[in-house]
């Protein structure tokens, strides 16, 4: 068994310094250049308030290269000739960073996903999942003949569906740069070819948001949950719009407790027609 403080060549004594371990007898350098885990003392930025650091941004799946690429910075201290030189270098560097049309499309799709995620205030974890889903669809060749915007919106919608975040197709389509048919076509392709773990949406997931939009108290929401459970027991939820079921149960609960909520207001919150809402209301009142 080799002793940690003995030379592996001559079994001599190891002399330790700040930067290396050297054998005192034969001069063999056993280890050198250890990792310095201490702080950085120098700054490489023109900003005097910038914290001295060598590390960049953390790795993220919301960037086409996971954030590993570098950038050529700007400086006001350069002369005109050097400024033009670095402008050319920056242009060539950007071309090298995006070598293919597929990378360019991925950058555009990820940018659209980040915009949609910011619009709905969804967390960065779901953002990374949506970007990963978009990249998987691109790798599988699903984007051929379809719009990038549609798949970006479909990635956000699919991520919301698989994580229990209640966002309807119409809500996503209203904020996206894709039409609703483009979104549904892309989502159907993802669901079919990628095998998304999506199941039926529980109408109860919509109740907190709809109750807040209609300014209804918590007890109305609790009563609406009981009405949803009653519809499920009678088998009247399967095959119906879960958003409309949630709005219908809230409207019914509000009506039974004399809260002033109109059918049109409840339908508008759920983005359904009053006819859809009345169907749920009729099922509950006939029960």
UniProtKB/Swiss-Prot annotation:
It comes from Halobacterium salinarum (strain ATCC 700922 / JCM 11081 / NRC-1) (Halobacterium halobium). This is Transcription initiation factor IIB 1. Coiled coil: none annotated. HAMAP family: TF2B_arch. It holds the Pfam family TFIIB. Residues 40-53 have a biased composition (Basic and acidic residues). The keyword Lyase does not apply. Sequence repeats lie at residues 111-194, 205-286. The lineage of its organism: Archaea, Methanobacteriati, Methanobacteriota, Stenosarchaea group, Halobacteria. Belongs to the TFIIB family. Residues 40-63 are annotated as: Disordered. The keyword Zinc-finger applies. One of its GO terms (biological process) is transcription preinitiation complex assembly. PROSITE patterns: ZF_TFIIB. Zn(2+) binds at residues 7, 10, 23, 26.
